[in-house]
Amino acid sequence: MARRPSTDDLRSGPERFMALVKTTVPPVHPAGLPFIGAGLALAAAGRRNRWVRGAGLVAAGANAAFFRHPPRVPPTRPGVVVAPADGLICLVEDAEPPAELNLPARPVPRVSIFLSIFDAHVQRIPISGEVVAVEHRPGLFGSAELAAASEDNERNSVVIRTDTGAQVIAVQIAGLVARRIVCDLTTGDKVTIGDTYGLIRYGSRLDTYLPEGTDIQVLPGQRAVGGETILAELP
């Protein structure tokens, strides 16, 4: 049956235009506002010079796109783990969790997502639960596409324990250009699947470590949508 148009659907003029903008253009993460502001300030300061003005506007637009924070609708099925970020599934393998977490040194399933500079760089909670550990480790800034990035690059690890006792680890990894990891979580936080918890600036990688026996639902080469794509189902 056809849907009756709502009052919002019948608006016209400026109100209708603004409504379309709000539903089409994603909001920006607060961490990106200083970078957008810097580009606009450059454009304003160089308004008499078209090259400077253009460079400032391009920089502001590029940062607005990079720091975009699109709304997502996570699945409601219990026991699923969603992608913590947008990007390309680059590795699906078994690997030991980060050593700084002091967890048992035995391989567990790991899914790695590479984020290019064109992906949205906010990170999202992969599964609901409680944060039981947050550990930052300094390191290199090599290409995040390489397998060695998981071990060599700077990283920030978050361990989430579900209501059933399963532990899922999300690891933010800095890349060749990305040199600033932002994580808003602390130990003891209660988190909900799909919520935003941080970001990495300008190209990076996300590793998700899963319990043994987890049923992986993705393959290398597949595109992931943060907060929506199901990476795995817990045993």
Swiss-Prot record:
Concerning Pfam families, the annotation shows: PS_Dcarbxylase (PF02666)
Question: What broad class describes the main subcellular location of this protein?
Answer: membrane
- Modification after translation, per record: Is synthesized initially as an inactive proenzyme. Formation of the active enzyme involves a self-maturation process in which the active site pyruvoyl group is generated from an internal serine residue via an autocatalytic post-translational modification. Two non-identical subunits are generated from the proenzyme in this reaction, and the pyruvate is formed at the N-terminus of the alpha chain, which is derived from the carboxyl end of the proenzyme.
Q: Which GO terms describe its cellular component?
A: plasma membrane
Which residues are annotated as active site? S204
Its Gene Ontology molecular function terms? Answer: phosphatidylserine decarboxylase activity
Q: Give the membrane topology, semicolon-separated if more than one.
A: Peripheral membrane protein
The GO annotation for biological process reads:
phosphatidylethanolamine biosynthetic process
Is DNA-binding a UniProt keyword of this protein?
no
- Give the main EC class: lyase
Residues bearing the modification Pyruvic acid (Ser): S204
What family is it from?
Answer: Belongs to the phosphatidylserine decarboxylase family. PSD-A subfamily.
Query: Oligomeric state and partners?
Result: Heterodimer of a large membrane-associated beta subunit and a small pyruvoyl-containing alpha subunit.
Q: NCBIfam families of this UniProt entry?
A: PRK05305.1-3
Name used for this protein in its record: Phosphatidylserine decarboxylase proenzyme
Source organism phylogeny: Bacteria, Bacillati, Actinomycetota, Actinomycetes, Mycobacteriales
Q: Which gene encodes it?
A: psd
